[in-house]
């Protein structure tokens, strides 16, 4: 892929990732102002840190991506690019949680 084509593609993927983040964010924050409410709620229920919840969600997508790379087969109803975009969004969410934790120290 030529550099200009890659940049154009990457910009379109980032736009879609942002759309997904906003759409799914509404579902999981339940009109709360805390972007990480869902992770914190689950973490509290099972007595682990919110960052670990995000890592578990990320790893679920990474396993799917790994299986696709190794087999070349999509084994889910969700297209592989959807998994890649979700993984990148979980990295952003995890980064935000790390930033929040560092700010609270």
Regions found by a protein language model. Give the residues of each.
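Intrinsically disordered, low-complexity regulatory regions
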Residues: 1-105
């Amino acid at each position: 892929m030529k550099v200009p084509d890659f940049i154009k593609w990457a910009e379109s993927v980032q736009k879609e990732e942002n759309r997904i983040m906003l759409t799914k964010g509404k579902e999981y924050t339940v009109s709360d102002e805390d972007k990480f409410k869902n992770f914190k709620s689950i973490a509290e229920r099972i007595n682990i840190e919110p960052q670990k919840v995000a890592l578990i969600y990320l790893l679920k997508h990474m396993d799917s991506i790994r299986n696709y790379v190794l087999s070349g087969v999509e084994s889910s109803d969700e297209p592989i690019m959807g998994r890649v975009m979700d993984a990148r969004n979980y990295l952003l969410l995890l980064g935000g949680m790390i930033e929040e934790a560092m700010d609270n120290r």
